[in-house]
Regions:
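N-terminal intrinsically disordered, cationic/polar leader segments
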Residues: 1-90
Length: 90
């Protein structure tokens, strides 16, 4: 029996971390829920876009539940979730 993954996650909902959940989509969409969104929402969005561009991923829905993760943590979680879903392209 073959199972096709439709969603993948990486991370935790602990302090200074984030939980990234991704799923296949028709277009790129990003949803961010963060305790520091007012201060760093634009920066978080930029890290997501930059990381997805590096991975050459365009058609995906990204949901991020953030508890103050640093940029490199956020990028690592996105990369891991993409690899788990199988949408990572070299």
């Amino acid at each position: 029996m073959i199972f096709i993954k439709t969603t993948a996650s990486a991370g935790t909902f602990e302090s200074n971390d984030c939980l990234v959940t991704i799923k296949n989509a028709e277009t790129l969409s990003i949803e961010i829920e963060s305790v520091v969104f007012d201060q760093f929402g634009d920066q978080i969005h930029e890290v997501v876009l930059k990381t997805l561009k590096t991975l050459n991923v365009k058609n995906i829905h990204v949901y991020i539940k953030d508890k103050g993760a640093l940029d490199y943590t956020l990028a690592a979680r996105i990369i891991t979730a993409c690899k788990r879903l199988g949408v990572y392209h070299d």
